[in-house]
């Protein structure tokens, strides 16, 4: 239990940040799911559009500290590889 005023404040801040981070993480996952669904349906143009809209969301997650830079890059690389295979 937080005893000092500073520790109590940090606990409150951490709760608020956790909520915001949870929403951001959920938003990123939604965009990634849209790409996955487009790939599964076999629609290359829809998959490419979904990938283009997911990329800034992933990078925003990196900027906000939700994802590590390499994690986002790895996800983008793997998704773009799969989208490219659809159109080929």
UniProtKB/Swiss-Prot annotation:
GO terms for biological process: translation. InterPro entries: Ribosomal_bS20 (IPR002583), Ribosomal_bS20_sf (IPR036510). It comes from the Bacteria. Residues 12-22 have a biased composition (Basic and acidic residues). Residues 1-25 are annotated as: Disordered. Binds directly to 16S ribosomal RNA. PANTHER family: 30S RIBOSOMAL PROTEIN S20, SMALL RIBOSOMAL SUBUNIT PROTEIN BS20C. HAMAP family: Ribosomal_bS20. This is Small ribosomal subunit protein bS20. The gene is rpsT.
